[in-house]
Amino acid sequence: MTLWNFYFQLFDKAIAKEEVVVFLSYLLQRISSPLLIVWDRLPAHKSRLVGEFLDSLNGWVATEYLPPYAPELNPVEYLWGHWKQHELPNVCPKDLWQLSEGARRTLRRLRRRPCLISAFWKQSSLAFD
């Protein structure tokens, strides 16, 4: 999630260190400027594999961690809250494919609302110097 946009990938399993590296590679293909990634403390984010991958980028990607147990500081939590309440309320997909396609479609639609993305950052009260 940038201040005006967000990037996502859907995986058919729980996110582990390998998926984090795949997603970082995906970001690097789409964003041509250095990145600051603000992460929660998911163990995969702090794994050796992810650390080695980040080290191989020679400072192109910097990371900061949110304090433990502070979902209110994570703008992604506000994105998910909005998504569940306003984009997919009462959705009952017939199968995993239908769920995946519905998620992809609604997340892409949210990308076209930069003011809303900006509001998620403001709600989180994160300060950038």
Residue ranges and their predicted role:
Residues M1-D129:
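Short functional hotspots at interaction and active-site rims
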